[in-house]
Structure formats: C-alpha cells, structure tokens
C-alpha cells in the first residue's frame, strides 16, 4: 500500500471477497462488519474494524474516496422465497444503505443477489470473467454465481463485453462450502469452491455469502478510472 492509493470503504465486508478484488484494482481497503473477520483480513492484508455498517460509515466515510456495500442478501434470495414468510425474517437494508451512501457524497457500489431492489444494476456471472475449477470425477466446472452491482454517486458501470455462457457443468457454492443436495460430492468439494471463487483464504462459513474477487476487480477498475477522471476535473 502507498499513501497515494485511493481508499475504499467496504461495508459488510465479510470474508474479504470484495476487498481482495478492490485491492487488486489498486485500492487501499477498510473493511467493516459486525462479525469477526480479522483472520481473513490478516491473511489478505486489509484493514478491518468490527462494527455496524452505519457506525463504520460515520467513522470512516470522510477518509474514503469510494464506498462498496454488500447488505445481507437473504431477504431477496431465491432460497428464502421458497418458504412462505422466511424472507420477512431477514433485514431489508438495501434502501437504508442507499440513502446513507447518497448522503455520504462519495461514488458507491451496492452489491446483492438477483431479486434485490437495486436501481439499474449490472449483472456479473462467473462465466463472464472466466471462473472455473476442476474436481476429480467431474472434470472442468464453471461458476455462475450471478450478482448485481448498482453504481451511484456519479459512478457509471459499462456493461460486460461478454454474455453468460453456461455450457460447462456448474459448481454451486452454497451451504457453507458443503455439497448438500448437489450432485458434486466427495473429497475436494470445498477446495474446488475456493478455487472457482478465487478465495483460497476463506473458511467454509465465509464462502457461502462471498462474492468472487474477480467481480470486485471488474468494478474496481472502472471505479478507479472514475476517480482519476474526477481528479482531472479539479
């Protein structure tokens, strides 16, 4: 890290999937989460503080050049929709987070699952950024893991140049890195999930809700250029 690096505040940072991608794009990252992810932060080298998202935004917002937020996705997920009343048990934070980020006055990105109430988001799929793995007995597998990214605060995201390609058999990363009812069973499943996601440092529990660093890198490259453009206008 260098003093000239732009600072990105990563709210709901979890196991550091987004943080790693933004770091690879050139940002210094400050991670905020109510759960303890000091181990992950230490392994990949970003600053971490255990606190609520709004406390982190209040304390570190002025230091940040940009903000990324990944509010809890369970309320909007397909799995929750399968059980009547389950979604309502989870917090609905996309709206409050957006309002707070707009008030912060920094370029921002809100990430969530398909079905979340995001404004004009860009969707990324593992096939768009070449995320694959191999598993004994199953050969080459592709990662789908569709995620939405809403830009705000003046930031615009160009759509991906490639479309989804679900030709390969899919490795599904859910259930805390365990195969569950998936047809992919046996030794090496969790390791294959980590390889497909590009998150070698994560625990099984962190895998479930993480985004691949490649997604955040794709966003981060455009965010970095946006900040350069803003600096050139001053």
Where are these regions (language model features)?
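Phosphate-coordination loops involved in phosphoryl transfer and adenosine-cofactor binding
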Residues: 3-5
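SAM cofactor-binding core of SAM-dependent methyltransferases
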Residues: 7-57, 68, 76
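Class I S-adenosyl-L-methionine
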Residues: 11, 33, 45, 54-66, ...
């Amino acid at each position: 890290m260098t003093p000239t690096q732009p600072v990105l505040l990563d709210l709901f940072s979890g196991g550091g999937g987004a943080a790693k991608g933004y770091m690879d794009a050139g940002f210094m990252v400050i991670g905020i989460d109510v759960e303890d992810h000091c181990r992950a932060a230490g392994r990949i080298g970003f600053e971490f503080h255990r606190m609520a998202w709004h406390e982190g935004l209040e304390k570190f917002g002025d230091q940040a050049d940009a903000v990324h937020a990944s509010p809890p996705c369970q309320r909007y997920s397909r799995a929750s929709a399968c059980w009547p009343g389950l979604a309502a048990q989870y917090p609905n934070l996309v709206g409050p987070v957006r309002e707070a980020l707009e008030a912060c006055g920094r370029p921002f990105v809100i990430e969530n699952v398909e079905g979340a109430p995001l404004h004009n988001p860009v969707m990324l799929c593992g096939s768009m950024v070449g995320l694959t793995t191999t598993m004994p007995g199953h050969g080459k597998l592709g990662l789908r893991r569709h995620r939405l990214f809403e830009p705000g605060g003046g930031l615009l995201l160009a759509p991906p140049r490639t479309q989804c390609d679900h030709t390969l058999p899919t490795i599904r990363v859910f259930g805390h890195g365990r195969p569950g009812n998936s047809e992919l069973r046996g030794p090496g499943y969790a390791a294959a999930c980590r390889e497909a996601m590009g998150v070698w440092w994560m625990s099984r529990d962190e895998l479930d809700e993480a985004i691949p660093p490649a997604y955040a890198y794709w966003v981060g490259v455009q965010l970095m250029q946006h900040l350069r453009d803003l600096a050139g206008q001053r």
